[in-house]
UniProtKB/Swiss-Prot annotation:
Its cofactor is pyridoxal 5'-phosphate. Catalyzes a cyclopropane ring-opening reaction, the irreversible conversion of 1-aminocyclopropane-1-carboxylate (ACC) to ammonia and alpha-ketobutyrate. Allows growth on ACC as a nitrogen source. It catalyses: 1-aminocyclopropane-1-carboxylate + H2O = 2-oxobutanoate + NH4(+). This is 1-aminocyclopropane-1-carboxylate deaminase. The active site is at S78 (nucleophile). Belongs to the ACC deaminase/D-cysteine desulfhydrase family. Homotrimer. GO terms for biological process: 1-aminocyclopropane-1-carboxylate metabolic process; amine catabolic process. It is an enzyme of class 3 (hydrolase).
Amino acid sequence: MNLQRFPRYPLTFGPTPIQPLKRLSAHLGGKVDLYAKREDCNSGLAFGGNKTRKLEYLVPDALAQGADTLVSIGGVQSNQTRQVAAVAAHLGMKCVLVQEHWVNYEDPVYDRVGNIQLSRMMGADVRLVSDGFDIGIRRSWEEAMESVRQAGGKPYPIPAGCSEHPLGGLGFVGFAEEVRAQEAQLGFKFDYVVVCSVTGSTQAGMVVGFAADGRADRVIGIDASAKPEQTREQITRIARHTAELVELGRDIVEQDVVLDTRYGGPEYGLPSDGTLEAIRLCARLEGMLTDPVYEGKSMHGMIDKVRLGEFEPGSKVLYAHLGGAPALSAYNGIFRNG
């Protein structure tokens, strides 16, 4: 496998820490050892997150093309767009963000706090669009890029989650290589890695990275899109493309992509009672904050799988914390009383 042939622009502090979740593990019976790899603490750029790791491989391409404007898309409370805005500010580039109405949640301050507030503070041109949630290339995003061209700018396209970008899976191939180095220091290997999946490139990169040592199917994706067939197809397609890029040496097959579809509801961006319980439990036992859109759902999935005995006794499970806490203030109605 050859990830090193791709240029990388450093935006993160370095390897993200692995934290034992001792109190949560004990609360769930102590038969499974839970750990978290803190991608939510990976950068000084506006709280970082998993997209910052991906953007390290997109930035060299943007600079090589002479782009002057990063153009990205997400929901109103998109973590992706906040991270793109931060990277643009860091590089001295312009930034245009399309923020679509992906979540059916009504709150008078929803489009004025959290991620979107931070993006505005960093100077991004934020454009609210009424289109609803879907996965894939969006017309509103293409129109935003054309508007930059018409104004004489040179846009660089960054799709939702970086996922439809040809280089979008590379960052989390690097995640797997980083975990292997940390495992050598820890003296053990993780039996499972749990990760939230929506647009797919985070899990896709992990699948490729862990395929290098035979653990592709030990990456357990927790769907948060509530459109699992689209998500599964996108993960598989991105993983196959990424495997070719890094010269993995074998094909990615359907069995490599494991996606648990039980925790994505009731719909994208809206939490179930189980998700809210998981968010509060993790916060109160570990002081670790997760959000109702992404990480709360993957935390719910991991907790439930432990309770149901779906991880063998003695298993060591690594939870990939991808970020998301900056969106919590947008859900203040749900968490008014904690």
